[in-house]
């Protein structure tokens, strides 16, 4: 469950290390984002010579949340930290590698590139 001002780790090699959610996309009254939702983020911490710089405002997709995600078969999955992948204007990842596991729910939301780059899909 991601809302405005939530800090997230970045799960790709775009150059950003930490980002902060500044908007949840999907309607003016929408308060929370979960796995597979697109948010607008501000880069708070970045590595030198990365593709994104500190202060950049970008779109990102949430790939891991500390709040559990319920599935139709009754199981739930949760992670230790919140994480996101930075996207370009075509909703494709900026980075060429994904770090850590991602959830199956991304497949239903057509983030196939992230699914294929991820080392593990839970």
From Swiss-Prot:
Work out whether the entry's keyword set contains Signal. no
Entry keywords, A to Z: Ribonucleoprotein, Ribosomal protein, RNA-binding, rRNA-binding
Which SUPFAM superfamilies does this one have?
Ribosomal protein L14
Query: Which GO biological process categories is it annotated with?
Result: translation
Which molecular function GO terms apply here?
large ribosomal subunit rRNA binding; structural constituent of ribosome
Pfam families listed in its UniProt record: Ribosomal_L14
- Which sequence ranges are marked TM in the entry? none
Q: Which GO terms describe its cellular component?
A: cytosolic large ribosomal subunit
**Which superkingdom is the protein from?**
Bacteria
Q: Which family does it belong to?
A: Belongs to the universal ribosomal protein uL14 family.
Q: How does it assemble?
A: Part of the 50S ribosomal subunit. Forms a cluster with proteins L3 and L19. In the 70S ribosome, L14 and L19 interact and together make contacts with the 16S rRNA in bridges B5 and B8.
Name the record gives this protein: Large ribosomal subunit protein uL14
Organism, scientific name: Dinoroseobacter shibae (strain DSM 16493 / NCIMB 14021 / DFL 12)
Taxonomy-wise, where does this protein's organism fall, top ranks first?
Answer: Bacteria, Pseudomonadati, Pseudomonadota, Alphaproteobacteria, Rhodobacterales
Q: Which gene encodes it?
A: rplN
